[in-house]
Each structure stands twice: as structure tokens, then as C-alpha cells.
Amino acid sequence: MKNKIFYLGLVLILAITGCSNSNEKELIESDEVSGSSSIGLIDDERILSAESEPGNWLAFGRTYDARRFSPLKQINKESVSDLGLVWSKDMGTNRALEATPIVVDGIMFFTSTWSRVYAVEALTGETIWSFDPKVPGEWAKKACCDIVNRGVAVYNGKVYSASLDGRLFALNAETGEKIWEVDTIIDRERSYTITGAPRVAKGKVYIGNGGAEYGVRGYVTAYDSESGDQEWRFFTVPGNPDLGFEDPAMEMAAKTWKGTDWWEFGGGGTVWNSIVYDADFNNIYLGVGNGSPWTREIRSPGGGDNLFLSSIVAVDADTGVYKWHYQTTPEDNWDYTAVQDMALADMEIDGEMKKVLLQAPKNGFFYVIDRTNGKVLRAHPFAAVTWATHVDLETGRPVENPEVDYSDNGAWVLPGPLGAHNWQAMSIDLDSGLAYIPTQENPFFYAVQEDYKKTGIFKWTPGKWNMGIEMSSLAQNILNNLDSQPKPGGFLKAFDPLTGETKWSVPIPHYWNGGVLGTAGGLVFQGDALGMFSAYDKDTGERLWEFNTYTSMLAPPITFEVEGEQYVSILTGSGGGDLFGGEPLPPIEIQALSLIQI
């Protein structure tokens, strides 16, 4: 009998693009309450023991280790051909969905555009409740890369979400009612935004922000998960030294900024994506973003590494006190953020078991870092890299390539500002020792802003992009240098972070594709920009199954199990950084798939 694809239900949720008010009638009012919940009962111990209940997806990266690899294997190489659509849910928007759903005890929690939050039945997609934070529509102009949101945290009967305009909410997981709300933004004269998912651990909620291009100063704040009271705040770049320093780490960092009043430009260093809790060392790892402006000769003309830009910073989970850092791109000059997903693992390196942190950031090198002290152990390129020749493991520093120095005449550089790997999630498979990475090679023609070169004065414009890069003549610069442009492309790669070997690589027609999920069923799932959701053989890269969603994908898939049956789910629809490509954005859905009974 021929396999069937069938719909169990389609729910329409209406919205008006360009403003935040939803036409959908909320099932739950958002008055502040203090009621308890009987669902969403996730605590530290449950996440730490997540391997004992693989049917749930309890945290942003599935576990605190954030490897995004599932032990479920009912859907495997032999059975994946029977995978078919169970339900889809129209989210009523033509903008990107980027969230990682949390699934616990048959209920799925996720976010949509404008920071709206949903709880749905995982088996049917039926809405249980929804919450709209009613972000002012004009806030869209403050967001660098669309009105997106990457998800929620669920903890002790509450759902934690952050809004584009910088508020943090605790919602009753059973009803969606608001329990508390706090304003996380320190200066509303600056264009701060939040698109990232909160993280939870040790009775705290951790959240960062975005807006580096607009001239903000980055920081991460920890709030008490029950009351919403602020527990600590860690700034990632120093402020005005004349006003004193918040802590010794900022005093240390200020010595690496030279020659200008950098604090007037904000400095950047926003933590807009990756925050990881490490129970082994009671650390919180912060993935820190780019400088404001991008160009170092404007930002810090006297030189210096500009800490903690483009760094992984370890702080104490209870106090926020600095422990160590590793800077992936000292003196960042290219928008090479280190906000990309981080994963934790125990790996044998040089004959010794090491507790390591793994990251494949924008700059194109895959870092294996000792979690005890921040020392880099491996740093192999996982994509085409021209800005540096290699990373010196003795010094821990990259060796820059002078042939692509763009300070005088401009130059094509790989990676470009979208990075060799961006926020789209990778998956770490410890059994094979491989990382499955959504990789891209998208060159950019960098040149210093012409007005600055002529006058020596950088005109910072509040509320606008302040990169220090020549953009007004970018198109002409590209046309003038087409002959030397490196070829762009997208790839799904299986990469060995210890040896630097690419085991297999699958080319994908577009470079801006979705996140990745690996499973013990021998599969790697990914959605791509052309609408194809695919399952690959994790050993060879062979495509074993595909499903046309008819809309682009950026979000990472997840998998879960309900009543003994495994499902795969993905939020579909493109946007975010892809808006710069001017591509049409079709309607957006969330979809759930399972093995079809025939």
C-alpha cells in the first residue's frame, strides 16, 4: 500500500505584519497572577538527567550540554522512508520562525514573530494558550535582522520568554497567565533588542540582548526565577573609565581599548544568542558578539584586543563573577561574533580525557576549549577562510593574512559578516566524534567608510547602523571586483573537530539554511532555504528522505516521543539575515512528522 501523508488539523493564527497586535483572540488573558502550574515541571535535576527521558526536549539544546543530539532511534535509516506529515499549524506570518520548541510531557512551547508565545498539544498542534507581549510596532526598526525570536525556557511550572523590546516574562505554564515581568534594558535611548531564548539554571533566568550595530553596550543579566528580582549583571565591554568600573573584569578589559571614547559608540559585545550552563564547574558561558562599530581602526585606533568582543566568557553561575575567557577574534574587524551555539562534552585529547567546550563561530575556525581554564586545544578551519592563515595554539591567537587587509583599498574576505556558521544550530555526535554543521561560504567586500578615510571623523548616528564599513558604494565596489570574488555556497558538513577532517560535505544551492539535528537512528535532519526538509545518513551524507515544505527554513529541527511514538518537528519560514537577499517570504508554519502507519 502506498504511504500516505495526512493532516490531523490546521489551525490559523492571524497577525498583521509590521505591527505587534495580533488579530487572534488570546485564549488566556495576561493579567498578572501568582498561581502555580501542574505542567512544565522541569528543574535542574530533571535537565541534568535528561538522558533518562529522551522523549522530552527539556532545554534549548535538549540538555544542559546543548549538543542537540537525540538518543531516539525509532526513526532510523531503515524506517525514515515512511516519515510523513502528521499536522501543520499556520502561524499567520510571512516573517521568519527561528525558535527551538521545548517539549515536556506531551506539550510543546515555542515562540513566533513579535515574541508571541504558544503552548500546543504536541500530538495535534491544538493551541492550549497563547501570549502576546504586544511589542510596539515601531520597535522593528531597532532590530538588525527581523522581528524574530528563538524560543523559551520552561522551569518549575513557568515559561520564560523575552520580547523584542527588551522585557522578560514569567508565564504560568498551564494557563499562559503572566506571573511577573521585568524590563531588562539599561538605556532606552539606545536601540537594544532581544531575539534570543532565555536560559534557566540554579533558580535563575539568564538573558542577554542585541543591537551592537546600533551602538549599545552588551551585558547579560541573571534574574531570580520565582520573583524576577535581579541577581547579577555582567557587562561584556567596558564603559567610560571616568565613571569607574563595575568589576575587576571591566577594569582589565578597558586596558585593551585605546585611542578613542569607545563608550560613546556603545562598544557592542552583545550576547544575543548562546548562553550555556555547566554544572561541572558551576559556570555560565557567554558567547559575545561583534564590536560597535565593526572597523577596529575607528573603534579603537590605538590598537588592543577590545575585550570581551568575539569571546567566550566563563562567569560564576551564582554571582556572575568573571572566571576566564577565550577570544576567538582579537581586534575583530569583520563582525566575527562568537555568539554561535556552544556545546559541552568530555573528549579524549592527546591521550587524556578533557572537559571541553565546542564552538564553530562566524570566523570559520572550530574551537575545542578546555573548560577548566579557557585554553584552546584545537582550532581547525571548517570552511573557506582567508582572513587568517591559522590559529597558533601556543598563543591561542589567529595569524591574520595581510593579503586581505582592507584598510587601504578594500578586499574580498571569507567569511563575510554572515559568517562561516551563524546562529543556525549544529549537532554534536560523540559516538562518531563529528559535528554536523550548517556551513556557508559567502564572501564580502570590506572597505573602510569613505567619509572617515577623508575626514578622520566617524559620524555615529543613533538608531542607525554604525559599522564603519563603506556601504554607499558597496554595489560599485562589488562590480569593480567581480573577477576576484570567491564563489559563494552552502553546505551541510560532518566535521571532526579534533583532526580538522571533513568526513562528508553536502552542497546546498543556497547558503542561508536551517539548523541541524542528529539522532541515534543514524540520521541528520536539516531544512534548507529552498523548502526541502531532509534526512541524511550521518555516516555518509547520503540523502535518505526529503519533504517539500514549500517555504524556507532556518530553525533547527527537534525530535520527541509521545505514547511510544517518535516525532520530528520544525518551524518553517525564512527571514532574519536572509532579508538582505530580497527573497520572497511565503507563509510560515510549524510542522510535526512521524512514521506513517499503513
Predicted regions: what they are:
Residues 122-124, 172-175, 225-227, 317-319, ...:
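Short loop/turn segments that connect beta-strands within beta-propeller blades
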Residues 27-85, 241-250, 397-400, 480-482, ...:
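Blade/loop signatures of beta-propeller domains
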Residues 57-61, 96-116, 141-167, 193-214, ...:
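Repeat-blade elements of multi-bladed beta-propeller folds
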Residues 89-100, 130-153, 181-197, 235-274, ...:
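Extracytoplasmic beta-rich repeat domains
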Residues 207-219, 259, 286-306, 441-485, ...:
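Short, conserved, GDST-rich strand-edge loop motifs in beta-rich repeat architectures
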Residues 66-185, 518-519:
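N-terminal cofactor/phosphate-binding cores enriched in small/glycine residues
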Residues 15-18:
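C-terminal motif of bacterial Sec signal peptides marking the signal peptidase cleavage site
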Residues 596-598:
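Conserved small/polar residues in nucleotide/adenosyl-binding loops
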